[in-house]
Amino acid sequence: MHVLHEPSAISFDKVGIRGKIFPSRELSNKAGFVLINTQAGHETTIIEHESDFIYYVLEGSGFFEVNDKKEECSAGDLVVIPAGSKFTYKGKLKMLLVNTPPWREEQEETL
């Protein structure tokens, strides 16, 4: 099936964010898709070593800090974070995250 419905269960709840991971690996091994909800933001700063992260802000507002540069974001904005970047984000946000290649826990470094 090519239509993936929003997962009903939370896939993870950590460091200030809750996420629902779409089961897309059987359709594509080149990208992963995650629905992110946060009330206050990411509690840590990370470096994602292998995947580009592309966030589309569906609701809310806040800011991303990427490589020590802070930029505000709100609904309708697209935030592109290249692999190897140091980043965090804050705010009450609902976002669709596309990561390419798909995210794996071992490729992420928490600072």
Roles of regions detected by a PLM:
Residues 1-32, 45, 110-111:
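A short, N-terminal "cap"/entry segment at the start of jelly-roll beta-barrel domains
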Residues 67-84:
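Short acidic-glycine-tyrosine-enriched beta hairpin
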Residues 83-106:
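Ligand-binding loop in jelly-roll beta-barrel domains
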Residues 50-62, 67-68:
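Glycine- and acidic-residue-biased ligand/ion/polar-headgroup-sensing regions
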Residues 32-49:
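Conserved short histidine dyad/triad with adjacent acidic residue
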Residues 7, 37, 99:
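Residues at the C-termini of beta-strands that transition into short coil/loop
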